[in-house]
């Protein structure tokens, strides 16, 4: 009974440690999706034309994804950019 109890305590400690760990640290080696800015069409305006409308427009144009993004720098206006 002592071994079973020790194993259960160890299992619960490991489970607790995993659940409390920071997910960003666990996924720090993941690559972000990269896309070309060649297919940026509509200007994104908060409250009027956002990520949802951008995604719908891009899928209607035959792309898999669409996101509101700056073309080159943070100072540039945000456009709807489509990519696969």
Curated annotation (Swiss-Prot):
What compartments host this protein? Secreted
One GO biological process term: defense response to fungus
Q: Which residues form the signal peptide?
A: 1-29
Q: Does the record's keyword annotation contain Cytoplasm?
A: no
One Pfam family it belongs to: Defensin
Q: Please give the superkingdom of this protein's source.
A: Eukaryota
Principal localization?
A: secreted
User: An example Gene Ontology cellular component term from the record?
Assistant: extracellular region
User: Which pairs of positions does the record mark as disulfide bonds?
Assistant: 40-82, 44-68, 54-80, 58-81
Keywords of the record, alphabetical order, are: Antimicrobial, Disulfide bond, Fungicide, Plant defense, Secreted, Signal
Q: Which family does it belong to?
A: Belongs to the DEFL family.
| Name of the protein in question | Defensin-like protein 49
Organism taxonomic ancestry: Eukaryota, Viridiplantae, Streptophyta, Embryophyta, Tracheophyta
């Amino acid at each position: 009974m002592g071994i079973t109890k020790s194993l259960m305590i160890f299992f619960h400690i490991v489970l607790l440690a995993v659940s409390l760990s920071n997910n960003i640290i666990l996924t720090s080696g993941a690559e972000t999706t990269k896309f070309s800015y060649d297919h940026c069409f509509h200007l994104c305006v908060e409250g009027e034309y956002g990520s949802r409308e951008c995604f719908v427009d891009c899928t209607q144009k035959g792309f898999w994804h669409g996101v509101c993004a700056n073309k080159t720098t943070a100072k540039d206006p945000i456009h709807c950019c489509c990519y696969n």
